[in-house]
Amino acid sequence: MQRQGIHGNILGENILKAGGMAMLMFTQVQQPSSLEEAHALMIKQKMAPVLAGGCWTRLGNRKWPMVIDLSGLGLRYIEEDDVEFRIGAMATQRDVEVYEPFQTFANGAFPKAVKDILGVQFRNMATMGGSVAARFGFSDIIPLLLALQAEVRLFEGGRMSVEAYLSYGKRDLLIEIIVPKQDVPVAIEALRKSTSDFPYLTGSVRRDDSGYSVYIGCRPGKPIRAVTACDILNEKGIDALEEAAEAIEGDVTFQSNSHASAEYRLSMAKNMFKRLVKEVDTWK
């Protein structure tokens, strides 16, 4: 079923009063009833934003001619089997935060990753799919998914790693996030000026049979792997931690913005790198 021609000034105000957030204005809303229909709309209406939780779309004063609402596609779920978790694109950050198996999986990394994202009211609305699809550099969630070697499932692109998705150029429908059940040490960290602020630096680390993989995000760009630093650590071991941390300067590009300068981010990234590596080394 597809609805057209609903006046967004009325519907939008009702939605946003319930959420207590900024105004979202649109002229028309499309509510596809199938994945096929949703994807076709995304391809046809290239300028129409996809409305998941709507927490970012509503920022600013723009009035959208059309939005595509995914709430009728049945994508709000968290499932698991013996080998993986599957997080539907419309599952909220709060759903992930309180999901019982995530309290212990990866040493509680999922609740830790989302607990400082604004307030509970926001996390009740912000979706996991929207958080990943937006590919914001300041994301708390993406560094964790990289460390967990998570994948996404797309309507057209199929399954691909989150790392590959960060560079995926097509407009495609994100259906779910897939997290393998691997018992490997991971750690995450996000640095903020205040509890409710956006982070000015994020990081994550994974240690498995192939060695260490450390990702630095909010540079303020998207998270990337500190390749040279990890190579030094994997070749020389933990005794070369200081040398590896210094290699971040040539590995990762930082920029300045209103949250932090490039120089400050670099300094903090070196210290974060050392803390993250030491944390996974304490895992038994």
Q: Which residues make up each language-model segment?
A:
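C-terminal structural segment of proteins
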Residues: 2-284
